[in-house]
Design a protein with these regions (language model features):
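Bacterial Sec-dependent N-terminal signal peptides
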Residues: 1-26, 465-466
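A non-transmembrane, solvent-exposed segment enriched in polar/low-complexity residues
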Residues: 20-178, 185-211
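N-terminal targeting signals for export/organelle localization
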Residues: 248-328, 466
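Short active-site neighborhood of thiol/selenol oxidoreductases, capturing the structured segment around
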Residues: 342-371, 387-391
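Structural microenvironment flanking redox-active thiols in thiol-disulfide oxidoreductases
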Residues: 365-405, 421-424
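Short, internal strand/loop/helix patches
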Residues: 401-437, 441
């Protein structure tokens, strides 16, 4: 029995020892107050401090628990001294030496390879810069054009050979360090294909090319890659390209990559959450329901979707997937500033801007002030072709009546949804106000939730300001 207990105790000791990290950091010729170990956090998009110690020329960073896989930076005060990958709970005992711009790892093969790769990348870049300089010299000289073209063709061939060497080198690294986070990083850095000639001078075609290629080398299989700034940077670049593309081009490409992420559920949820924050958040400058709604619909079809996420996505979809362009706005009763009681559909107008607001909301007030200065808006109202209807939809009647006497624009119509049906019946998404809907004579939506800075261009496009 004692032997068995001793054996179990020994096993526990071994497991405990294997779960620790022990990183010796030696820095030569540098002074600071503190040395910190920082790990990248994908959700917060920044490095978070894991450990802080007083600075010394030699410091041992250690802990009883192993470091989570990810990308780490060691900083002396605010100066980054070294970066490294952690791939698993093993091999967390190594040494880093830093002097001037030189660094060296002992006991960590993948991080030694990381440093070597950076050095080789500089070599490749320097060789390409030589070709750039040669090209500049060719452009300056007075040789006949056919001779210049021959020389340029030679430079292009040499550049392709260099890029081919780099590609082969990186693929060899991927194979040699297969299974490590470093290998996934190398995969993400593989050279993207050159854009076709048709993309030059055509921004729309170039964006389509980028949307098709930016995530081509993304390591969807490796959830550890999320704990690196490289993942966030790639996804941020992709998000901006998608945002500025036409909807019919953007949506299928966005959904295709979200399907690709399904090979790893952790990746899927993290990447979806990131795009949801960008395209679905009420405060995001990249908010776009035309992208967000298809995302939600596709995720609700994912067979392994977590119950909590399913409930949230269904609620979100029920809130925003209505009053879309081409839909007829739902009717609701209103008390007008004149004392009449009408419904929205009873107000005749060739075009109407329905302005949902709270009179005391600071942003609502700011937008109203900006609208006062809009020449095309004022001309369209004066022509009789456009009516602006402000709608208060909350319960404080006295607040609305003060607004009528103190702040209301006499050129607008003003109404209160006195039955509060807008909110109780969930007719509109009024979580962020002001919220403006531009509709035609049938109350059919032309623009949903239109930003104020898009008002004047739309009025001009419709020819209402003449």
């Amino acid at each position: 029995m004692k032997k068995l207990l001793f054996f179990c105790f020994s096993i526990l000791c071994v497991i405990s020892a294997s779960a620790q990290y022990n990183i010796t950091v030696k820095i030569y010729g540098f002074k600071a107050d503190t040395l910190s170990l920082n790990r990248f956090d994908f959700e917060k998009n920044k490095f978070l401090v894991q450990q802080n110690l007083p600075y010394a020329d030699e410091v041992i960073l250690k802990g009883k628990k192993s470091l989570a896989p990810g990308y780490y930076v060691i900083s002396a005060d605010s100066m980054d001294m070294a970066a490294f990958f952690i791939s698993d709970e093993k091999n967390q005992k190594f040494q880093i030496e830093v002097w001037n711009d030189m660094k060296q790892f002992s006991g960590s093969e993948e991080n030694s390879a990381f440093l070597s790769m950076k050095a080789r990348e500089k070599e490749f870049d320097n060789r390409l810069k030589v070709l750039d300089n040669e090209f500049a010299e060719i452009q300056k000289n007075s040789l006949p054009q056919y001779m210049k073209q021959t020389m340029v063709d030679s430079l292009v061939a040499r550049a392709k050979r260099i890029m081919g060497e780099k590609e082969n080198y990186m693929r060899e690294l991927m194979e040699r360090y297969d299974g490590t986070l470093f290998a996934s990083y190398v995969q993400s850095q593989l050279q993207l294909p050159e854009p076709p000639q048709s993309c030059y001078g055509n921004r729309d075609l170039y964006n389509i090319f980028l949307a098709d290629t930016l995530l081509a080398n993304y390591p969807w299989h490796d959830e550890r890659f999320l704990a690196t700034p490289f993942a966030h940077n790639i996804l941020a670049d992709y998000m901006k390209v998608i945002f500025y593309m036409p909807q019919n081009e953007a949506v299928p490409r966005l959904l295709k990559n979200l399907r690709a992420a399904q090979v790893n559920e952790t990746q899927l949820y993290a990447v979806f959450d990131y795009f949801e924050k960008m395209f679905g958040s009420l405060t995001s400058p990249y908010r776009d329901e035309k992208l967000y709604i298809p995302m939600l619909k596709q995720m609700l079809e994912y067979k392994n979707l977590e119950t909590g996420r399913k409930a949230r996505y269904e609620f979100e979809l029920s809130t925003i997937d209505k009053n879309n362009e081409g839909d007829i706005l739902p009717d609701f009763p209103m008390l007008m500033s004149t004392g009449e009681t009408l419904s929205l559909h009873q107000v005749p107008a060739e075009y109407m801007l329905v302005y949902f607001q709270n009179p005391d909301c600071p942003t609502c007030s700011q937008v109203r002030e900006k609208m006062k200065t809009m020449t095309h808006l004022k001309n369209a109202i004066a022509s009789g072709r456009l009516k602006v209807l402000t709608v208060y939809f909350e319960s404080d009647e006295s607040l609305w009546r003060r607004y009528l006497t103190q702040k209301a624009n006499p050129d607008y119509l003003h109404a209160w949804n006195y039955t509060l049906s807008i909110e109780t019946d969930n007719l509109y998404d009024t979580r962020v106000i002001p919220m403006m809907m531009f509709v035609d004579k049938d109350k059919k939506v032309i623009r949903k939730d239109i930003p104020y800075n898009d008002l004047e261009p739309l009025i001009q496009k419709l020819g209402l300001s003449k």
